[in-house]
Amino acid sequence: MVSGTGARLLSGAVIVTCAALLGPSAPNGAHTAKPLPAGAPEEVVPNRVMTWNICNPCNGSGQNVGRAAEIATYAPQVVGLQEACVRDVERIRDHLQYQYGLVYHVEYGSVLRDWGRCGGLPWSPGGFGQAVLSAAPMTDRASVEYPDGGSEDRGYMAVTTLVDGRPVRVFNTHLAHRHQEAVRAEQVGVLAKEVARHDRSIVLGDFNAVPDAPELTGMWGLATDVDPECGPSATGICETTTDWHTKFDYIFLRGFDRLEHGVRPSHYSDHSLLHADVGPKQPGRLSHPGSRVVFRPDVKELRADTPPRHPNGSLIFAANGMPGNRT
């Protein structure tokens, strides 16, 4: 029989042990909402998408409360998170719902289980990888590990949801570390093959590569990033998305046009939030960065007067908006 004092000591020891087992993703603060900037939306904004590498390990006090506030500032319809622990995403989603009234469905694409990163129990560590939050329901979830992840397991996930009121395939990926170019090239090949199957797709993620990196050629051949100044042939100033002043994060659009976009640095990650408002693809609009569209009233064509240095060449659109011959 255990005395009252002994029972209390035993109970305290159990609590301490459980707290240690739960690991770094255990609750780290009360559910106190952080105030949002003036003008922040009160409801989910239709057709707004976001990608964010939330940084792990970045487990200071109040991280998930702060992450939720960053997302709520823009209230996107679809959010792709990388370096995401399942437990952290659950808390972020709870904060979004109960503190800001933003309700999201969630799907996961965990590529490994890691107690050191994501807590849990030694025999059941937390999942780590990608996650997608969507205001609309999601179906047909796929989670794929790349054959070669590089120095750490990497992969992509995909879901079908609604954007602009129509089904769209949303991908979320995190490619190999920055000094593993050959590995990333193979990973892009795997991802691009699947993206090419869908006329309407949005690819979110941390590609760990700058826009003119050779390994991204496969993506530029299929889609365009939401930043018109970022691309293999763009000549403008490409806005960076990391604390080390590089562009690693992308929202690739296929079958959509970018309406506007923004980059928001964050205290809660070494990556910035990249968000964009998108709309259906308009016939005749040239989408490749680094090109201009010239309207010629004397001819029945539209063409790029400065063809981008792009694997599939410059595009010519006839007056009826249908693609013409490639030059």
Predicted regions and their residues:
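A well-ordered secondary-structure block
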Residues: 120-168, 172, 257-260
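Secretory targeting and sorting signals
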Residues: 1-31
